[in-house]
Each structure stands twice: as C-alpha cells, then as structure tokens.
C-alpha cells in the first residue's frame, strides 16, 4: 500500500489497517513455517507495509496533539 493512500485515512482506519496487516503477516509466517509459501518476498512487503502504516499513524497522533 502506498503512503499517500495511508495518509488519506483517519486514525481509526489506520489502526484497523495495521491490525489486518499484522494478522496477514502472522498467516504468512505460518505458511512459511509449514513450507506452503512459495513467494517469500510477500513477507518482506507486508512487514514494510506495517512499518509504513505505523509511521503515518505516529505522525497523525503527534500532529493532533
């Protein structure tokens, strides 16, 4: 997900997005552990999406304070 798409969301939507990404990341790690995952780069992309969303969430919270 692009940063511009995340910046358009409000704080509650960002928190839900982070929660969804964390669940997806967990599922991907479990697939990797059971050797069902063929494209391992998806884990890296998901991890970076989580970091991107958390960064924007922090920016929004500090901007509102």
Curated annotation (Swiss-Prot):
SUPFAM superfamilies, A to Z: Ribosomal protein L29 (L29p)
Q: Give the keywords, sorted.
A: Ribonucleoprotein, Ribosomal protein
Q: CDD domains per the record?
A: Ribosomal_L29_HIP
Q: Name one Pfam family in it.
A: Ribosomal_L29
UniProt keyword Ribonucleoprotein present = yes
Name the source's superkingdom.
Bacteria
Q: Name one GO cellular component term.
A: cytosolic large ribosomal subunit
User: A Gene Ontology MF term for this entry?
Assistant: structural constituent of ribosome
- Signal peptide location in the record? none
Q: Check the record and name the InterPro entries matching this protein.
A: Ribosomal_protein_uL29, Ribosomal_uL29, Ribosomal_uL29_CS, Ribosomal_uL29_sf
* Sections of the chain in a coiled coil: none
What Gene Ontology terms for biological process does this UniProt record contain? translation
Family assignment? Answer: Belongs to the universal ribosomal protein uL29 family.
Record-given protein name: Large ribosomal subunit protein uL29
> Gene of origin?
rpmC
């Amino acid at each position: 997900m692009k940063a511009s798409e995340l910046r358009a969301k409000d704080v509650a939507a960002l928190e839900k997005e982070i929660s969804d990404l964390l669940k997806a990341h967990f599922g991907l790690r479990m697939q990797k552990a059971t050797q069902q995952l063929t494209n391992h780069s998806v884990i890296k992309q998901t991890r970076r999406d989580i970091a991107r969303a958390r960064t924007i969430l922090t920016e929004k919270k500090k901007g509102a304070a």
